[in-house]
From Swiss-Prot:
It is found in: Cytoplasm. Pfam families: CLP_protease. This is ATP-dependent Clp protease proteolytic subunit. It catalyses: Hydrolysis of proteins to small peptides in the presence of ATP and magnesium. alpha-casein is the usual test substrate. In the absence of ATP, only oligopeptides shorter than five residues are hydrolyzed (such as succinyl-Leu-Tyr-|-NHMec, and Leu-Tyr-Leu-|-Tyr-Trp, in which cleavage of the -Tyr-|-Leu- and -Tyr-|-Trp bonds also occurs). Fourteen ClpP subunits assemble into 2 heptameric rings which stack back to back to give a disk-like structure with a central cavity, resembling the structure of eukaryotic proteasomes. Belongs to the peptidase S14 family. One of its GO terms (biological process) is protein quality control for misfolded or incompletely synthesized proteins. Its EC number is 3.4.21.92. SUPFAM superfamilies: ClpP/crotonase. It comes from Shewanella sediminis (strain HAW-EB3). GO terms for cellular component: cytoplasm; endopeptidase Clp complex. Cleaves peptides in various proteins in a process that requires ATP hydrolysis. Has a chymotrypsin-like activity. Plays a major role in the degradation of misfolded proteins.
Length: 203
């Protein structure tokens, strides 16, 4: 059963009506855009959202393994493990995944933006990008806290290395620049190597 905010949100999603040989057919706008190989990654990156994105990526691969997929990102970030599920699927499937930042791509959102196919990562002109180190908090016995601290440090090093690979920046620059919240304009993100270009007009 849907909770009240979710049902209100779903009621606000526009519907598109199409004429087919079998009569009229209606889609919500996101399902219609999925037919055009467009996926929206919007809001907090968490497990449920990640599963939906992964399912859409796999579905579009099964439909046409040689056609690009377009992933539009407007996200403040979120769970590292959920984000890595999306990232690994982007790298795993055959189609190139072109990423486009609309609004913001922060934290894990920025990581997924940078993880798009080389030459096919873009920002719109007034979008913002933010990179930083992973956040973590844990309560419990001292030995368990130490274990979790080591895990977070390991994740931090792995994410930094992957960002270095995608941006072409040296590892020491990535480590310095992710030490605190680091905000960039679209042009700065392109200069840094997080994206390949800033798009003001289609085509």
């Amino acid at each position: 059963m849907q909770n009240a905010p979710e049902s209100v949100l779903n009621a606000l999603v526009p519907m598109v009506v199409e004429q087919t040989a079998k009569g009229e057919r209606s889609y919500d706008i996101y399902s219609r855009l999925l037919k055009e190989r467009v996926i929206f990654l919007v809001g907090q990156v968490e497990e449920h959202m990640a599963n939906l994105i992964v399912a859409q990526l796999l579905f579009l691969e099964s439909e046409s393994p040689d056609k690009d997929i377009y992933l539009y990102i407007n996200s403040p970030g979120g769970s590292v493990t959920a984000g890595m599920a999306i990232y690994d699927t982007m790298q795993f499937i055959k189609p190139n995944v072109s990423t486009v930042c609309i609004g913001q791509a922060a934290s894990m959102g920025a990581f997924l933006l940078a993880g798009g196919a080389e030459g096919k990562r873009h920002c719109l002109p007034n979008s913002r990008v933010m990179i930083h180190q992973p956040l973590g908090g844990f309560q419990g016995q001292a030995s368990d806290i130490a274990i979790h601290a080591q895990e977070i440090l390991g994740i931090k090093n792995k994410l930094n290395q992957m960002l270095a690979d995608h941006t072409g920046q040296p590892m020491e620059i990535i480590e310095r620049d992710t030490d605190r919240d680091n905000f960039m304009s679209a042009a700065e993100a392109a200069e840094y190597g997080l994206v390949d270009s800033v798009l003001s007009k289609r085509g």
